[in-house]
C-alpha cells in the first residue's frame, strides 16, 4: 500500500506577530483557535502563499469582504508582513519518504503601491533533525536572532552535504517540482490551472458552495481525456499537417515557380547587365581605338583646314581690296552714265528750247510788225476820232450859240463873237496876226497845201524809218549771235569776230563728224584692253593656284601636259571606282554573311546550351544526332524498368499502410463492425479490456484467446440472444464472452502453458493448441510495437518509393528534355560554330576596311589632282585665246591716244551742238555787221517831228476851215441881217452837225475796234516776249548746266557709258560673288575648323574619358570576373546568346527583370536590400553579389535530405519531381488519415460512459456525508440533448452530411461545427470560429451537464444551492465537492507522475464556528476516510476532540506585538500533551 504524502509543518518567519513560528500539522485536522485578530487568517495566508505564490491570484480578504469585488490595495498580503526578509515554508514528506521543504521568500517593496516581492524555492535532502527555523534564522544571543537573506540561506544550504537548494524564476517550474514530488495533486501547467487550484483553495478557505467551481464542475471533475483528445488532435494535426503540407507543396510549387521566376529574372537581370558590361567593355575598347583614329584623322583635317583657311583668307583680302577699286570704278561709271544721261536730256532740252526760241523769234518779229501797223492805224483812228469830236463839238457849239441867238437878240452877237474867236484861234495857231475873215480862205488853201506836204513828208519819213528799223534789227540779231557765241565784245569788233567764228565753226564741224568713228574705235580698243586685263588676272590667278609663275610661251605646253594628266587620272579614278565597288561588294557580302551568322548564333548557342545541359544531366557526350536518338531509346527502356519497380514498392507500401490503419483502430478492433456490435450489445471488446497488457504478456494472451481475442464481453449472454436473430452485418466468426467488463479476468479458460505455446481446454473433448505469435497484436503495447516496426518498414518503403518515383520522374523529365531538344535544336545543334566563322569574317572585314580606307585616301588624292588639273585646263582654255592680247603692250597707249582724239572731237561736237544754230543764223546776215546803223535815232526824231508838224498843220487847217466856215458871221451887222442869215446857217449847222456826229460815231467805232485789236496784238506780243525771255533764260541755264556737267553728250556716249558700267558691274558682281563664295567658304572653313577644334577637344576628352573608363572598368571588370569565378556562376551569367543583343535591348531586359524582381523579393528584407544596392549602375559587382545572394538564398531553402544538390537550378528541377511525388503521396495519406464520423461518435460515447461510471464511483464515497439536514451528496451527470442528437446523426445519419466531412476546405473540427450549426440553427454561436466550436465538440466534457444534488430532509434530492441550505450545510456540501474535485484530480494525474507517489491532500476552513459539532465530526470522518489533512480556524469555543489544536493569543509587550501560541493534541481519550515548539517564540532581533 502506497502511503500518502503529508504536510509536516508550516513555518512563518518575520510575519506580523510571528517572528519565527513553526506549526506542526496534524495528519488529519489542525485547528487554529483564538480570538479576533489572533493571527488565524495570517497563518492560513502564509500557508496559501507558500502553496500558490502568484500575486495575480492571491487576495486575502476579511470575512466582511466576502462577496466584495475588491479588497484592500495590498490584497491582504503586504499588511501581514514585517519589514525586511520574510519566509513562509512548508515542510512535507512524500510517499517515497522524501523530506521536501518548499517555500517563498517575501519582502515588502517600498512605495505607495504596497507591493510584495516573492521568490519561491525548494530544499531537498534536508535531515529530519534540522528544523525550518534553524535554516532561516541566525541566533545572535539568548534574546535576539536575525533572519537570513535568501542568498545567505543558499550559501548555508550548499555548505550542508546532501542538501539541494533550488530557486525558481517561474511559478510553473515551482509547481512542476511540487507535482513531481507529490506535494500537489495536479500538474499546474498554465495560469488557468493555477487559477483553478487557487479557486479551490479559496473556496475551501472561506467555506460554502463556490459558484466559480460549481459553474465549472466539468473542468474540475472530468479529466481532459488527453488520449482521445490527443488522438483527435493528432488526427486533425496530421490532416492539417497533411493539408498544410499539400498547401505548402502548392505554395512550394508556387515558390518553385517563384524560385524559377526569381532565378530566371535574376539571371536575366544580372546576365543582361553582365553581358551588357562585357559588350560595353568591348565596345568601349573599340570606341577608344576609334576615338584615337578619329583624333589622328581630325588633327590632320584640322591642319589641312588651317592651310586652306590661310589661302582663302589671303585670296579674300585680295578680293576685298579689288572690290573697293571696282566699287569706286563702278560708282564712277554709274555716275558718268548718269551724267551722260543727264547731259543728253539737257542737250535734248536745249535743242528743243532753241527750236522753240527760233520759232518764237519768227513769231515775235511778225507780231512786232503787226503791232506797229496796228499802232499806226490806231493813231490814225485816234486823230480821225479826235477831229470828228472837235468838229461835232464845234458844230454843237455853233448850233447852241445860234439857238441862243435865235432865242434872244444877242444870238448874232454871239455868232459874231464866235467867229471872231475862231478867227483869233486861227491867227494864234497859224501865227497870222493879219488874218481876216476874207483872207482866211486863201490862207486855208495855203495851210491845206502845207498840211498835205507835211503828211507826205511824214509818210516818207515813216517809210524810211521802217527800212532803218529793219536794218537795225538784222545788225542787232547778228551782233547778239556773235555775243552769244563769243561773249561780250565791242560793236565795232563784231565783224572780225563773226568771220573768225564762222571759220572756226567749219573746223569744229569737221571734227564733230569724226566722233562716231572715234567712239567705235575707242570702244573696240577698250574692249580689247579689258580682255587683256581679264587675261592677265586669269593668268595671275592660274599661276597662284598652280603655285608657279608661267611665261606666255609655256602655257600651250602646260595645257597639253594637263590634258594628258587628266586622261591618266580619269583612267585611274575609273579603275579606282571599279576596285572600290569590288571591295564594297565583298564587304557587303561579308556583312550580310556576318548578319546571317549573328542571327543564327543565338539559336546555335541555345542548342549548345540545351545539349550541354542534356550531357550534364545524363553524363554522356553527343557528337551527332544519331547519338541523341540512340540514348533516347536507352532512356525509354530505363524508364520502363524504374516504373515497374516503383509500382511493386508502392503496392507493398499500400499493404503496410492498410495494416497500420487496421492496427490503429481504437480499442484494438480490426473490424469496425465489432465496435458497433459491442455498443449494440452493451458490451466491451475483449481487446479493449486487455488494451493495457504489456508487450511481454501480449504473446501469452494472444495465444490464450486465439481466434476469440476479438470477442465481445457482455454482462449477460441471455440478453444478447434476441440481438443475434437476423444479424448479418458482422464478421464470419463472432465470439461473445459473458463477464463483468470492470472486473474481467482470464479464469474462464483452463490453460496449460508450454514453451512458447499454450493449451486451452475449451471443453472436455476440445482442446486448442496455440503458439505464441512472433508478432503479437494483442494489447495496445503490442499493436504499438507492431505499428512502430511497420512505420519503420514504411519509412524504408517510402524512401525507396520516393527514390524510384524521383528517378522515374527525373527520367521522364529527361525524356521530355530530349524530346524538346530533338524538336527544337537537333537541326542546328551539330552544325559548325557560327561564332568562329564570325571571328574569321570579322578579321577579313577589318582587312577590307583597312584596304578601303587606304584606297579612299589614294583615290581622294587622285581626285584632288584630277580636280586641280581640270581647273587648270579650264583656266588655260580661257587664257589661251587671249595670248595675242597678253602680247600686245601698246594697246593701252593706243587707247589713251584715241581717247584724247575722241575728247577733242566730242568737244567740237559739243561746240557745234551748242553754237551750230547761231553760226547758221549768223552766216547769211554777217555782212550787216560791216556798218552800224547809228542814224536810226535821228530818223526817228525826224519822223516824230514830221508827225508833229503834220498834226500842227492839220490843226491850223482846221482852224482856218472853221474861220472860213464862220466867215459869214463877220457880216452880221445888225439883228435883221442876223435873223435872215441865221436861218440858213442853222440848217447848215444842223446838217453839218449830223454829218459830223455820224463821222464821229464811225471814228469812235473804228477807234474802239482798232483799240481792242491793238490790245490783242499787244497781249500776243507780250506773251511771245515773255515766252521768248523765259525760254531764253531756260536755254541759258541749260547751257550753263551742260557746261557745268562737263560731259560731251553725243549719240553713242550713253551706250558706251552703259557698257562700261555693265562691264564694271559684272566685274564687281563676279568679285563680290567670288568674295561671297570665299566668305562663305571661309565661314564654312572657320566653322569646320571650330567644329574640328570642338570635335578634337571632344575627341580628346572622350578618348581620355573612354581610356580612363576602360582602365577603371578593367579593374571593376576584374573584380566582377573574380567574384563570378569565385562563386562559380560564370556558366550562368556568361550567356553568349545575349552578346548579340543591343545595349538598349539588354538594358530593357535588365529593367524588366528588375521590375519583376522588386515584386518577387518584396517580402524578403535581405534580398530587397541587396537588390536595392545592386541598382547602382556604377557598381556592377553588386549585381553579382545580388545574384550570389539569390543563389545562397535558394540554396538555404533546399532540403538536403530530399534534394542533394547545391545548384538551385538543378534543385528546382528536382523539386518539381519531388513535389509531384509528394502530392500523390500526401493525397493518398489524407484519405487514409481521415477518420469516420461514426468512429468519432463511438469514441465520444465510450468516453462519456467511462466518465459516468467514474462519477458513480465518486458518488459512492459521498453517500454517507451528512451536514445538518443534508443526509447525502451526489453528482448528477447527463448528456445534453443537442449533443446527443449530434452523436446520433454522426453514427446513424452521417451519409446525409458527407458534403461537410468530404470537403478538403474544412477540417474535421470545422465540419463537426458546421453540422452542429445545421442541427441546431436556433443556437447563437457568437463570434466563435467553426474551428473553435469543432474543437469544443471533440471534447466529451462539453457533451455533459453536471450538477450537485443534496438529499435534504423531507425535500429529497434537490439541487445544491446556497440559498436552499443553511450556512453549515453549504460549507459541508462545498467541502464535499472540493474533496471530490481533489480525488478526481488525483485520478486524472495518476498516469502523469510516478506510480509510487500518492499526493498530499489538504484543504482549509476558516471560521469553522459556523459548523455544529455533528458537522465537524463529519469533516473529521471524511478526512480520515479520504486520508486528507484539514486546517480549520475557529473561535475559542471550538474544541475538537481529535487532531491538533493551536491556541493563539496576540500580545503587545513594550511596543512589540507578537502572538502567543499553545498547541494541544487530542484530548478526549488521551491526556493533554504539549507539542514540540509550543513555547513562545523568541523576540525579534533588535
Swiss-Prot record:
InterPro entries: MukB, MukB/SMC, MukB_hinge, MukB_hinge_sf, MukB_N_dom, P-loop_NTPase. Residues 666-783 are annotated as: Flexible hinge. GO terms for molecular function: ATP binding; DNA binding. Residues 326-418, 444-480, 509-603, 835-923, 977-1115, 1209-1266 form a coiled coil. Gene3D superfamilies: 1.10.287.1490, 1.20.58.850, 3.40.1140.10, Immunoglobulin FC, subunit C, MukB, hinge domain. One of its GO terms (cellular component) is cytoplasm. Keywords: ATP-binding, Cell cycle, Cell division, Chromosome partition, Coiled coil, Cytoplasm, DNA condensation, DNA-binding, Nucleotide-binding. It is found in: Cytoplasm, Nucleoid. One of its GO terms (biological process) is cell division. ATP binds at residues 34-41. Belongs to the SMC family. MukB subfamily. Plays a central role in chromosome condensation, segregation and cell cycle progression. Functions as a homodimer, which is essential for chromosome partition. Involved in negative DNA supercoiling in vivo, and by this means organize and compact chromosomes. May achieve or facilitate chromosome segregation by condensation DNA from both sides of a centrally located replisome during cell division. Homodimerization via its hinge domain. Binds to DNA via its C-terminal region. Interacts, and probably forms a ternary complex, with MukE and MukF via its C-terminal region. The complex formation is stimulated by calcium or magnesium. Interacts with tubulin-related protein FtsZ. The hinge domain, which separates the large intramolecular coiled coil regions, allows the homodimerization, forming a V-shaped homodimer. This is Chromosome partition protein MukB. It comes from Escherichia coli O6:H1 (strain CFT073 / ATCC 700928 / UPEC). The gene is mukB.
